[in-house]
């Protein structure tokens, strides 16, 4: 399959730079997987689409202020984007500089350059950096870091983004990008879902900056997926198995929840799904056999991205590309701060190719 099979024309004006005033007031495009039928509505319609006993699986990662500015002690500006926190002192990061720092180089970070750090080693495209500070990494980032808005949100981060680019249920700091499908759920909607009898479970996948990396090969089978850390604890496994046993659906909120659950299913030897605490490089594209997910809540993704491939593997290629065409015609808002989709599984998708 060619990467270009997943291209579509998107007017710049449809890229959302700010979220809706109310989280749950965005538009919702529903795609019926088996038939391809589309219905238009608002996000709160999700209440009517879920049945008592259905299981919603959320990603409870929390975005860290992962973008740092500063300079090398030897001169030259740098921009640091944390990929992951290794421990209380060390990070793995992308560093933009006119000349990459060498091992042992001292970095001065923050607007006042008050935070000192040392570049320890290079691991491919990533740099291992150690902070020379008493405070733990997370405290330093909260003090001097900027929210790492995606590259297509073409504006500086604002104080409001610290709340807006964050789900209301995120409790596990470590992501450098929000699991954006979850941004649409506010407390009143969560309360109504609970009152209806919808079950909820939480996985953790710390979204890395690699999620924004373009696919740089022509044939998608040759693409190597970036690695991200995911946790699917025993209580999630139990909740999934219980939902299936009573004939209910497992609904993933966001592609990161999909990738967490499907990674746990792949790792399970003789069960549908087993606990998973590891890095995952799962790459889902047409031809993939879904194990766990029955429905999906997700935002609109970038052309030629691994995420539109994941959706195509779930709903079917033709149904997905048609839904995106209609979304553009109907002026839905795209990407992280944009509108959402509710998609049910298409059992025929596995045999469909572009």
UniProtKB/Swiss-Prot annotation:
Compartment(s) where it occurs, according to its Swiss-Prot or TrEMBL record: Cytoplasm
UniProt keyword terms in alphabetical order: Cytoplasm, Queuosine biosynthesis, S-adenosyl-L-methionine, Transferase
Main location: cytoplasm
Residues spanning the signal sequence: none
Keyword check for S-adenosyl-L-methionine: yes
A single GO molecular function term of this UniProt record: S-adenosylmethionine:tRNA ribosyltransferase-isomerase activity
GO cellular component: cytoplasm
This enzyme's EC code(s): 2.4.99.17
Pathway: tRNA modification; tRNA-queuosine biosynthesis
Cysteine pairings via disulfide bonds: none
Catalytic reactions on record: 7-aminomethyl-7-carbaguanosine(34) in tRNA + S-adenosyl-L-methionine = epoxyqueuosine(34) in tRNA + adenine + L-methionine + 2 H(+)
Keyword Cell cycle tagged: no
GO biological process: one example: queuosine biosynthetic process
Protein family per UniProt: Belongs to the QueA family.
Assembly: Monomer.
Function field: Transfers and isomerizes the ribose moiety from AdoMet to the 7-aminomethyl group of 7-deazaguanine (preQ1-tRNA) to give epoxyqueuosine (oQ-tRNA).
Protein name listed in UniProt: S-adenosylmethionine:tRNA ribosyltransferase-isomerase
Organism: Klebsiella pneumoniae subsp. pneumoniae (strain ATCC 700721 / MGH 78578)
């Amino acid at each position: 399959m060619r990467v270009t099979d997943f291209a579509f024309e998107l007017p710049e004006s449809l890229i959302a730079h700010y979220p809706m005033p109310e989280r749950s007031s965005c538009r919702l495009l529903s795609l019926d997987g088996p038939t391809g039928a589309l219905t238009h509505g608002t996000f709160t319609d999700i209440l009517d689409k879920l049945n008592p006993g259905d299981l919603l699986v959320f990603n409870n990662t929390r975005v860290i202020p992962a973008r740092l500015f500063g300079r090398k002690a030897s001169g030259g500006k740098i921009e640091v984007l944390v990929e992951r926190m290794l421990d209380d002192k060390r990070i793995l990061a992308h560093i933009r500089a006119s000349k990459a720092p060498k091992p042992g180089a001292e970095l001065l970070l923050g607007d006042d350059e008050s935070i000192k750090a040392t570049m320890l080693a290079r691991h491919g495209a990533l740099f291992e950096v150690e902070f020379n500070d008493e405070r733990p990494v997370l405290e330093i980032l909260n003090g001097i870091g900027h929210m790492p808005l995606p590259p297509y949100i073409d504006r500086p981060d604002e104080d409001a983004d610290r709340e807006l680019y964050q789900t209301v249920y995120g409790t596990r700091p470590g992501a450098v990008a929000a699991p954006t499908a979850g941004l649409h759920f506010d407390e009143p909607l969560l309360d109504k879902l609970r009152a209806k009898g919808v079950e909820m479970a939480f996985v953790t996948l710390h979204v890395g900056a690699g999620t924004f990396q373009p696919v740089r090969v022509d044939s998608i089978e040759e693409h190597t997926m970036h690695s991200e850390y995911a946790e699917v604890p025993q209580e999630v496994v139990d909740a999934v198995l219980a939902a299936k046993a009573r004939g209910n659906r497992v609904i993933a909120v966001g592609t990161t929840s999909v990738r967490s659950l499907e990674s746990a299913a792949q790792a399970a030897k003789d069960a549908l799904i087993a606990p998973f605490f590891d890095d995952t490089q799962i790459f889902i594209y047409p031809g993939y056999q879904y194990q766990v997910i029955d429905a999906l809540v997700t935002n609109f993704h970038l052309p030629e991205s691994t995420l539109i491939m994941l959706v195509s593997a779930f709903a079917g290629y033709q149904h997905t590309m048609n839904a995106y065409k209609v979304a553009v015609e109907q002026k839905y808002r795209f990407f992280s701060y944009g509108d959402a989709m509710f998609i049910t599984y298409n059992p025929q998708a596995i045999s469909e190719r572009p």
